[in-house]
Swiss-Prot record:
Pyruvate binds at T45, I203. Homotetramer; dimer of dimers. Disulfide bonds: none annotated. It catalyses: L-aspartate 4-semialdehyde + pyruvate = (2S,4S)-4-hydroxy-2,3,4,5-tetrahydrodipicolinate + H2O + H(+). HAMAP family: DapA (MF_00418). The keyword Transferase does not apply. This is 4-hydroxy-tetrahydrodipicolinate synthase. Pathway: Amino-acid biosynthesis; L-lysine biosynthesis via DAP pathway; (S)-tetrahydrodipicolinate from L-aspartate: step 3/4. It is found in: Cytoplasm. One of its GO terms (cellular component) is cytosol. Its main location: cytoplasm. Belongs to the DapA family.
């Protein structure tokens, strides 16, 4: 199922920097048991930028194997160079994933024409569904609704993860792209309103540690029950902020370790583990979210 409550899954690691497959399997089972609708493996939150391509593919293969058809798996396939994106996409297509999620190229600042050519080339390299990912806070490139609408004409580009936090884009994207084009929020703090305005799902960081509560909030919003959605969203609101007290996924890895979901909070350089000054803040907001820490 490619709608609803989707987790942007962390990639657990051992202290030597290798992938912790035992913890990875626990995470997949945890999300299946908690009712999460789909998993994004090796996206931004999964540290795609610091994994070698062989590691990237291996993690996706493991998640697909652990999932065993019980939950949909979406693989990150973002790349700064189109040729690299095509190569990665063709390799990921052999893993059994249900879809792929590709962030806009970053740093090299392509024009709208370049963005369209980039995503079209990647989509044309496979039959597997592709989801665009717009996150200008990280890429310094804001893919405009008109560009997304042009890409929506490509048969296997099925949706966009919109992480600007601007919920007014929901109506514009729906009008430009049609009812069948999937609209995902990539911003936990505005996700409730995004869904109430007609979005289809949320690809969430907080979902790593509060999947059941986040699923209830999403289901309420998707059904149009604004009052119930607000009640559950309010419980999680402090957590949304504290999970970004340092660069994602630093805080969510630390929180996952505190909950015993992963063996340790190791994160690859140039990111470092959560600064001690933020431990109290995160613990307090975890308690507010009714987590036992």
């Amino acid at each position: 199922m490619l709608k609803g409550s989707i987790v942007a899954l962390i990639t657990p690691m051992n202290r030597d920097g290798s992938v912790d497959n035992a913890s990875l399997e626990r995470l997949v089972e945890f999300h299946i048991n908690q009712g999460t609708d789909a998993i994004v493996a090796v996206g931004t939150t999964g540290e795609s930028s610091t994994l070698a391509q062989s590691e990237h593919i291996a993690v996706v293969e493991q998640v697909v194997s652990f999932a065993a058809g019980r939950i949909a798996v979406i693989a990150g396939n973002g790349a700064n160079a189109t040729a690299h994106g095509v190569e990665l996409t063709q390799k990921l297509a052999k893993t059994g994933v249900d879809a792929m999620l590709g962030v806009t190229p970053y740093y090299n600042k392509p024009s709208p024409k370049g963005i369209i050519a980039h995503y079209t080339a990647i989509a044309n390299s496979t039959d597997i569904a592709q989801i665009l990912y717009n996150v200008p806070g990280r890429t310094c490139l804001d893919m405009q609704p008109e560009v997304i609408a042009e890409l929506a004409k490509v048969s296997n580009i099925i949706g966009v993860k919109e992480a600007t936090g601007d919920v007014s884009r929901v109506a514009k994207l729906r009008a430009l792209c049609g009812d069948d084009f999937l609209l995902y929020s990539g911003d936990d703090a505005s996700a409730k309103d995004f869904l109430l305005l007609g979005g289809d799902g949320v690809i969430s960081v907080a979902n790593n540690i509060v999947p059941k509560a986040f699923k209830v909030m999403c289901d309420a919003a998707l059904s149009g029950n604004a009052e119930l959605a607000k009640i559950h969203d309010d419980t999680l609101r402090g957590l949304y902020g504290s999970l970004f007290c340092e660069a994602n996924p630093i805080p969510v890895k630390w929180a996952s370790h505190q909950l015993g979901l992963i063996t340790n909070a190791y994160i690859r350089l140039p990111l470092t583990e959560l600064s001690e000054q933020f431990h109290g803040l995160l613990l307090e907001t975890m308690k507010q979210a009714q987590l036992k820490v």
